[in-house]
Amino acid sequence: MTNSNLRTENHFDYVKITLASPDRVMEWGQRTLPNGQVVGEVTKPETINYRTLKPEMDGLFCEKIFGPSKDWECHCGKYKRVRHRGIVCERCGVEVTESRVRRHRMGFIKLAAPVSHVWYLKGIPSYVAILLDMPLRDVEQIVYFNCYVVLDPGDHKDLKYKQLLTEDEWLEIEDEIYAEDSEIENEPVVGIGAEALKQLLEDLTLDEVAEQLREEINGSKGQKRAKLIKRLRVIDNFIATNARPEWMVLDVIPVIPPDLRPMVQLDGGRFATSDLNDLYRRVINRNNRLARLQEILAPEIIVRNEKRMLQEAVDALIDNGRRGRTVVGANNRPLKSLSDIIEGKQGRFRQNLLGKRVDYSGRSVIVVGPKLKMHQCGLPKEMAIELFQPFVIHRLIRQNIVNNIKAAKKLIQRADDEVMQVLQEVIEGHPILLNRAPTLHRLGIQAFEPKLVDGRAIQLHPLVCPAFNADFDGDQMAVHVPLAIEAQTEARMLMLASNNILSPATGEPIITPSQDMVLGSYYLTALQPGASKPDFGDRSCTFAGLEDVIHAFEDNRIGLHDWVWVRFNGEVQDDEELDAPSKSESLSDGTRIEEWSYRRDRFDEDGALISRYILTTVGRVVMNHTIIDAVAAA
């Protein structure tokens, strides 16, 4: 038993893009119905009937070709409901199935005359011109009906294979051939348009040409050799992919599924449609007109003009504006062709396939978070609850706060204190990734420990800004949540901001203080010119430890740049270390006091240090105390 809803996994090694043969293009769009009828060819330019709003049969939205527009319902309405699955309606010929088949079922247009593919003709390099070993200008003259090309010189002594002839030149040769005294028995054959191009490409025997080119390459050098190698490379690629050169000339055009070029009704009763429908309509109209002209044996000049117009219509469909005048729609806007949909920044590959939105991600503006540690970032509660929702739901159920997922989601929507408590537990030790586009080197995406913050902006430590090339003038950053334990471990071990201090490019530190940080550090440690230094023992300016200085500063008893005497048990390095003290005094208890400009030491009888006071500013005490705390915490 097969079920269309089941996905079958096909494992493959690679995807190969090659030229499609006309038979392959017809295979894509052609289907045989159970009643034996073959469908797939789009023959009418109509889209929908504006009275019934149903797709026209054999048109660009035909339900017989592409499938029903409503689930389990045929065009005429005879069959409705899923129980008729797979039945083909006898009246309208529509298969009863799901409407989503209209996203992948293709059709085709059988052309009344071959047309050249504009990519291979006008691309850089032009593969048609390289294969035929002709200048691109000459090939264009043939394709767009400006010149004839000699396909077979026959017995004519002045003609050569692939020689170009103007209209007048060919008329003269015709007069010569059909003259009564003509000695030409084997008449020369000439062609024009994509048909002639197809004939020239069919005449190429790739293996023989490749062999001949290899021999010529051995005996040539310089520019000529480079040109021969270029041609040989193209021919070898054709041989390797089993593609024929004449497939670059189209006999059949695929019609992409209708749901990929939709037509939607607007509020006022008007319709908005994809540009592709207009381009396909032009091709079908011109193709039908050409077929009718050929049927009634119209004059050659009229048929030729119609063939040229068909060529231009197909060019516009494949790549509008590549050659000739750009086809425009309403208000002179160029119509978007198949190439425009694929290529560029907004194209299918870069926008939709490479630039997909992923689950468990979000983005917001960044603001500075000076109180954060370097490996932390501030994550808005609103974002965190959304990103970590599955983890929160799991924990709520496990802790018996709720019984099911539905109840958990309701609780989360209310943002109760219980939920916030659980969220705090969930994010504890769960790193997140921050990315700033463009990610030009590996430090453009780093891991951080999230801290819940109010507001809607992500808080970032200022020291990691150089790595991201970020500033706080409106930059946005993306957040990603690593889900697997392996991913979380890797993020913590390899990607944590505090583990990425050196630049991978130069090996120099990339985490360097700048701007406000440098200015703040300078201001904190600067000496105020002309400030008076207190005497040792002045109770308002002498302190027993660094903490006492900071408490006095916080209580506004002293200013940031005031001089203070503070007891300090650590090592002190200064320029006066080697000089003799400015004052040395022995006390009655056997101890000795030595004084320098910025230091006062007291030693016991054995010369061991009892106490040390240093003269410094409050700002320098704050700086030193902060560094000691940070080192101790690490």
UniProtKB/Swiss-Prot annotation:
UniProt keywords, alphabetically: DNA-directed RNA polymerase, Magnesium, Metal-binding, Nucleotidyltransferase, Transcription, Transferase, Zinc
Enzyme class, broadest EC rank: transferase
SUPFAM superfamilies found in the cross-reference section: beta and beta-prime subunits of DNA dependent RNA-polymerase
GO biological process: DNA-templated transcription
Free-text remark on how the cofactor is bound: Binds 1 Mg(2+) ion per subunit.
Cofactor requirements of the protein: Mg(2+); Zn(2+)
Residues holding Mg(2+): 471, 473, 475
Keyword Transcription part of the UniProt annotation: yes
Positions of Zn(2+) binding: 74, 76, 89, 92
Disulphide connectivity of cysteines: none
EC nos: 2.7.7.6
MF term (GO), any: DNA-directed RNA polymerase activity
Gene3D superfamilies: 1.10.40.90, 2.40.40.20, RNA polymerase II, clamp domain (4.10.860.120), RNA polymerase Rpb1, domain 3 (1.10.274.100)
InterPro entries, sorted: DNA-dir_RpoC1_gamma, DNA-dir_RpoC_beta_prime, RNA_pol_asu, RNA_pol_N, RNA_pol_Rpb1_1, RNA_pol_Rpb1_3, RNA_pol_Rpb1_3_sf, RNA_pol_Rpb1_clamp_domain
Catalytic activity from the UniProt record: RNA(n) + a ribonucleoside 5'-triphosphate = RNA(n+1) + diphosphate
Gene Ontology annotations for the cellular component aspect, listed alphabetically: DNA-directed RNA polymerase complex
Complexes and interactors: In cyanobacteria the RNAP catalytic core is composed of 2 alpha, 1 beta, 1 beta', 1 gamma and 1 omega subunit. When a sigma factor is associated with the core the holoenzyme is formed, which can initiate transcription.
Free-text function comment from the UniProt entry: DNA-dependent RNA polymerase catalyzes the transcription of DNA into RNA using the four ribonucleoside triphosphates as substrates.
Family recorded in the similarity comment: Belongs to the RNA polymerase beta' chain family. RpoC1 subfamily.
NCBIfam families (alphabetical): PRK02625.1, rpoC1_cyan
UniProt-listed HAMAP family: RNApol_bact_RpoC1
Protein name: DNA-directed RNA polymerase subunit gamma
